[in-house]
Each structure stands twice: as structure tokens, then as C-alpha cells.
Amino acid sequence: FVRGAGTRNPNSPLQGGLVIFAAGNEGDVYGDVRIYPAAYDPVIAVGAMDWSFRPAYYTDYGPWVDIAAPGGDRYSGKTTRTASDGRTVFYSNAQILSTILCDDAIAYQDGRKDGGMYGYGFMQGTSMACPHVSGVAALGLAYAAQNGKKYTPAEFKALLLSSVYGIDDCFAGSKDGELGPIAD
């Protein structure tokens, strides 16, 4: 399916598919262990960094991780607020605000629909970092389409990865040299 994506439309800016996948959240437990499908060569593996551009404590890492983006870090300071029902809610101002859907969620913005709670909540993980990279890739492909440019998946991956700061240029951390470039 990925090889055939974008090949039927001759005007597509990407002649094939591009897979961007979260690297995983076991780095603090297992260290440099390859997680699949993120570790496959054609895939862009996304690690997570905290608010200070350091690898998040949980992010999987290693030479197979291609890029890092903001993923949140709950240990980077906590804040409280009062929920609509009077409860004190603790959340990290260093996590990523995301949409949530679950029955017992403590949402940033409470609401009900069909008996379930929905709204926004603060979360962390490489799955919070991955949409940042996917969004930048989508913007890049939209720009390419507007300008009549065409790329193979390998060419676009190389372009995307060459347009970010190297993580070693930004800090010297505990995972120095083990996490891909920083999406800025």
C-alpha cells in the first residue's frame, strides 16, 4: 500500500508513500532497543524531546531514530487548576495538549457526547511528538504541490531530515548522539 500511494495521480508531489511513526516510550527502561515498525529504514522514526530540547526521559533512542519533536515530559513541573466540578486537577505545563475521549477523563475542557467524555487533556509520549513531524511533512508536500515539485519518498525524507537542527548542536544530554535531529 505504501509503495503504491501517490502513484496514480501524475500531479502528486510524492511519488509513493511516506510513513512517519512514533519511536516508542521505553527508552528509560530498555535503552537502545529497536522498536518496529519505526525502526524500518523507509520509515521516519520520531523520538520525543521535552520543553528544554533534551530527550524526554521515556523516549526510545538510537541511531535508528531519525528525528525528535516535542512530546512532553510530566516531570518538568506541575501546575494545578480547579475543574468545573470543584476538583483540583494536577497537570504538567510541559506536556502536550491533545484531544481525548474516555469515560473517566479529567479533561482540560469538560464535555459530554453520547455518554462519553471528550475534550482536551495533557499527555506525553512519542505519539504526541509524531503529529508535529507529520504536520511539517504535510506542509512541505503542500508547498511542493503548489510549486510543481515532485519527490520520491526517499528524496522527501532526506529533504525533511536535512531541514532540522542536529540534536547534538542543541545540547549535550544523557542520550547525546543517540537521538535524531530536532524538528524546529
Language model features: what each stretch is:
Residues 1, 41, 132-135, 155, ...:
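Extracytoplasmic/secreted proteins, especially bacterial periplasmic and envelope-associated proteins
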Residues 1-15, 72-83, 144-149:
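Alpha-helix termini
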Residues 5-9, 13-19, 41-45, 65, ...:
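Loop/turn elements at helix/coil->beta-strand transitions in domains of secreted/extracellular proteins
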Residues 15-17, 119-120, 142-184:
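C-terminal subdomain of the subtilisin-like protease fold in secreted/lumenal serine endopeptidases
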Residues 26-31, 53:
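Active-site environment of divalent metal-dependent phosphoester hydrolases
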Residues 35-138, 142:
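Extracellular S/T/G-rich loop segment that most often corresponds to the catalytic His/Ser-adjacent loop
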